């Protein structure tokens, strides 16, 4: 039976356990994703408490991390989503995304509405990808793809 969580406490604790086990075993999120049939971004988000994993994927990941049956069950529960407090993020990486939305949020909104009309881009019917590419000017660049289904506003 599908279960849902009413607080973030258990998933936050599990996320801490996952990160520690991942470090102890020197595994990457890509390695943890192997054999799940899911994307690296989705599995990573699930392990950090933002998605439920299907039973078979939860078992694959738990076996790699040495997690118990309770952890497998928790990984399958629908979480109470949202992990950023109602304040400006202080982690430098997360803050840069916040900054990007501060600078480009209204631009993104204007362009989405101009191209699609009144509506939103789903974060549920959604794909995320992160790639590292060489910068021709030296160093590396992060290519982040946010691919969400457009959902029009429906008058009622």
Swiss-Prot record:
It comes from the Bacteria. The keyword Nuclease does not apply. The keyword Lyase applies. Catalyzes the reaction of cyanate with bicarbonate to produce ammonia and carbon dioxide. GO terms for molecular function: cyanate hydratase activity; DNA binding. Belongs to the cyanase family. This is Cyanate hydratase. Coiled coil: none annotated. The active site is at 96, 99, 122. One of its GO terms (biological process) is cyanate metabolic process. Gene3D superfamilies: Cyanate lyase, C-terminal domain (3.30.1160.10), lambda repressor-like DNA-binding domains (1.10.260.40).
